[in-house]
Amino acid sequence: MRWFVYAGCFKTKWSGAFLFGLLLLLSRLALSAPARAAGRFDPVGLVNPFIGTTRGGDTFPGATLPFGMVQLSPDMPLRELPNGGSEAYDYSGDFISGWSMTHLSGTGCWNYGDVFFTATTGPVHTHAAQYGFLFSHRQEQASPGYYRVFMKTWGINAQLTATLRCGMAKFTFPSGRPANILVPISHVMTRLSHPCYLHFLNNHTLAGYVTSNIFCASRSARVYFVLQSNQPWKSFGMWKAGQRFPHRRTIHQKHQNHKIGAYITYPAPTHARVVKLRIGISYVGIKGAAENLKAEVPGWSFSDLRQAARRRWNRALSVVRIRGGTRRRRVVFYTALYHTLLDPTVFDDANGLYRGYDNKIHRVPAGHRHIYANFSGWDIYRSEIPLLTLLKPRRVQDMAQSIVEMYKQTGFIYRWPAANAPGGCMVGDPLTSCLVRIWEAGLHGFDMKTAFRGMWHNALAHHAKYFRADANVSADEEYDISFAALSGLAATLRHPARAALLAEWAEQYREMFNPATGFMQPRLPNGAWLPGFNPAAYGAHFVEGTGWEYLWLAPQDVQGLVRLLGGRKAFAAKLTAFFSGHHYDPTNEPDIEAPFLYDYAGRPWQTQYIVNKEARKNYTDTPGGLAGGGNDDCGTMSAWYVLSQLGFYAVDPGTADFEVCSPGFSRSTLHLSAPYKGRAFTIAAFRHSGRGQPGAEYIQSALLDGKTLSRPWFTESAITNGGVWKVRLGAKPNRLWGAARKDAPPSLSSITGFGPVKYLAKEGYTCSRPTGPLTLNGNMAAYAQRVPRIIKQSLLLTNSHNGEETSVWLNRRVLLAAPWQASFDYLLRRGGADGFYLVVQNSRAGKKLLRGSDGSDKGLISGGMAPRHSLGVGVENFRGSELELAYGAPAGNTQRRMPVKLGGTAPVNFNRPDHMIHVMVSYDGARTLRFQATQSGKRFTKNISLPMPLAKLLASREGYIGLTGGTGALNETQVISQWRWAEGASTRRPAAWPTPAE
């Protein structure tokens, strides 16, 4: 805690400043002595709320409770920061406008600042520049649940404390001047506030509401309040647009520029006057605010509320107890822990009612205590949620249910909901990752059936945005992370087809990797690389980062990324170049997991070195000492520090695993709570200096519950079941510990595994899935002979020699007898192509590849058209764009065709380069095939009556599906992507085939 005592208060004249300084010193002694006398653990005394209040940290020093709806904190005049962010309070300032009841911690964007009030002496002023005040940090004090400052301009001593939904202010006015309470309700941090309303209910109660834009001015929300004074007032009034209206009881603001406010004036006292205000807020209504006030602040004892807040914070912070290290390092640690316990925030009233995202009034679901709001999704899924699953499991389950309620009310899971306003700030689908992490941690106290439905809905909606015109690499990588998380959950919940499809989507980050440059790069809609790429350039297709930073953002598949970059040695070399070349940004989210990636490359000692170095350098006990000056983003950067100092971090948000680094303290204990089985998990680090200096920071050996731990990771259950992790540290790295390939943390690639299924193409060739889209040509032998069980989503059918056909079997059994539907996107990239066919074979056909000649119809033979047992439907451009139904003849390698001329009259041109066509082929289960193609909003549809031989072919219960294409000329390319296969009325589905209709 930082205690600021006015150095010049000891003067012969007993001024207000002297009294303030004396009271400040006495309060310090009074609060600290009992704790020391009793020997109780008092982590509140190790929290400095001023850490992070400058250099862009954007934290607030005011009074709040853990996850409280109210954050009663000072606001300074609105001003932009050099980095484009903004904050309500900056430690470098010396002028405060007043206080407001709502804030977010560390978001770097104008937000909240609702229900603003202040105090003055003398004449009533209605402009912020006039009613604000100068102050000195020597006369300012902050600790969890309490804030105090001496208002030099007015000679007023101000103190603040808070409950969950309410706050109390205590003003000690000097004698000899009128005392004023001002409520400039239109004053909000977003600058935009209307409509607003104020009403004097009686001579000690003011009520009203303020409507303000929420988070980066994206949406609006309304906050209702009730303000009461312990001293009835006789002189009061309102103002609008600077004009005062004495004794007016009600006022509305309907236009942005007509700002309103209320004032209360007390006569000049002959001695110091103490005025207390208690303020309750609600997002439901004025009645809700009044009930919150009645439930939480029934009396007027400021000290009782302050002590209650301190007790609440001591309980919350005592969930982690550390030993060792300097006092400064302990202050940094507990302040970081404090910051992780601020958001998300409680959003329901004391009676259990809350306003939903649909703007309707709802009740907290049965079995849950609270509804939470303010999910900084893009940030918190990385570190905040993994930490909270350990420390606050019951709250986290309520948070998960709150996300589910958002889906029920809006039909979507938004990535950055604030208050009751659904928001889409940033990119990706981060709250899916949050829900999965919570579930995988064993916290099942929320409606997963509805949650999964919402996450699946999100996944389908987001996947349609791939390869968009803005070529946003960051967005695609972020989506891959959530796809991987949901894939693992789908497998757990026994949705194998969806799990397979999502796992495939999760690996699409590889399609953004350009082996020529060694970086993830944006692509154009036609698949070509966007020109002018510079990996060090900030922005431009990378959200808040560079190509260097986003090279590493594949936490779901780090082992796949290792292979993509050429193996462990090449991966580690490039990662080292990333750090040594000053490309790493420890102040922001995109690459905060990067130091832990050495654990995947057989060099955990380098993870230990980098983490310790960055923690010491960027986290200090100064106002600018949070993440090197970055936004805390609702506890995300603070959570990184807390986890890293405990000795582990969650790289992959979709699993319940933690990657290891060296602990920062000699002993740390996590006190666990239900529903976890364990009572405590202890981290004991031996031979650690504990002084925050370079030295004994390298893991030499480790024991987990008495058993040797030789790998640089463990599961979350190892913690939540309780136990002891003992780590022996040394001054020199042990390059063997955790270095074996088998010891690397699991990734999507390693979980999916590799199977014996092979893609088949022209006689004599097999190929595996390469790092990019699958290319079928005459050079496939260069690829390895084993491929993943899950097919790639995009296939490139390319010929390097004139007149060669290519084909690929998807090697999945499908149900033919029932209705089915296959669909895909078809793109001709350059030149002309002979066409393509969707090929279906019954189970007796086999998959023997036969030689073919030119033409995509002959490609059916190359693709394995077996006599009597095969059917192909597709487009033959070689004869002038015919829709053909081809099937095997009774004998030999010839075909029968049912051509349907398309010619130049068809609305869809299959021979037009770089114009995507969506193709759908469906079977009604009887005698009809339906072929449909859509291009640029125009659609071609044809129903084909099957002859009896084909009807019998499809009567076979099971079969195989494949694709064949003929390019017919040098360097002609077709791209097939977005595969879908769905069966109707099916009682048996393929084990691993993508089935969105499941």
What are these model-predicted stretches?
Residues 1-12:
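N-terminal secretory signal peptides that target proteins for export/translocation
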Residues 19-28:
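Bacterial N-terminal signal peptides
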Residues 30-36:
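Signal peptide processing junction and immediate N-terminal pro/mature segment
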Residues 36-385, 389-433, 439-477, 490-496, ...:
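Accessory carbohydrate-recognition regions in carbohydrate-active enzymes
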Residues 46, 96, 146, 155, ...:
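Extracellular structured ligand-interaction cores
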Residues 161-163, 174, 267, 686-688, ...:
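Short beta-strand micro-motifs enriched in acidic
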Residues 759-994:
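Polar, low-complexity loop segments and adjacent catalytic/binding residues used for recognizing
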